[in-house]
């Protein structure tokens, strides 16, 4: 199985929907944490995160709390501390206060983090939700989502859905990805889809 590269999305600014607004002070606070993480100044980022969690958001189920929990997850994930990141991403989703598109971002981040610790059985239902919501509300479902679905199913020896999703990923890709094509070829051979394998072998 090819190595899956963890792709962490760190926003450069805080975006909010018309239904969810935060104060300028809070926006500056979150941006300050983003900047510390981006600069790899983890001590300062942790201080700000702990201050917010302990003094303002402990046990909170507000939009601001959800953003803080997501940031906490990013803080750990970008340092490859995936086990520590997982409960924070889970907590952000559990608030049920994220705008729909923001929740999609957290789902993908959480799915990647599950993958990195080998919890493939958790990746699949999470990304199924991601895909269903994306299709329902016309949000983009990138090739990377299908790739992660394919790798997770493959690790669980669920080769039919793994093959379906790697085909989706290859079809969506702007240019041929050699690793993806080779993985699709290996799955086609496992499933005895010899015609498909022949086509893939010429790409």
Regions found by a protein language model. Name each.
Residues 54-63, 94-102, 132-140, 173-175:
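Flexible helix-coil transition and linker loops at the boundaries of alpha-helical arrays
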Residues 16-74, 78-87, 102-105:
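N-terminal leader/linker segments that initiate helical-solenoid repeat arrays
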Residues 32, 72, 110, 149, ...:
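Structural register within alpha-helical repeat arrays
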Residues 35, 75, 113, 152, ...:
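Residue-level signature for tetratricopeptide repeat
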């Amino acid at each position: 199985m090819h190595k899956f590269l963890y792709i962490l999305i760190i926003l450069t600014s805080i975006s909010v929907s018309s239904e969810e607004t935060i104060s300028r002070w809070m926006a500056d606070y979150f941006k300050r944490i983003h900047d510390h993480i981006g600069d790899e100044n983890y001590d300062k980022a942790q201080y700000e995160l702990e201050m917010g969690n302990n003094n303002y958001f402990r046990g909170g189920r507000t939009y601001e709390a959800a953003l803080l929990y997501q940031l906490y997850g990013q803080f750990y994930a970008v340092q490859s501390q995936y086990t520590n990141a997982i409960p924070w991403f889970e907590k952000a989703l559990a608030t049920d206060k994220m705008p729909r598109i923001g929740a999609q971002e957290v789902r993908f981040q959480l799915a990647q983090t599950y993958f990195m610790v080998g919890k493939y059985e958790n990746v699949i239902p999470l990304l199924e939700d991601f895909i269903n919501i994306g299709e329902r509300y016309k949000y983009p479902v990138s090739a990377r989502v299908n790739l992660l679905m394919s790798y997770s199913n493959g690790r669980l020896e669920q080769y039919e859905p793994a093959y379906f999703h790697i085909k989706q990923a290859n079809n969506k890709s702007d240019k041929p990805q050699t690793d993806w094509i080779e993985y699709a070829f290996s799955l086609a051979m496992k499933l005895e889809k010899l015609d498909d394998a022949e086509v893939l072998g010429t790409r």
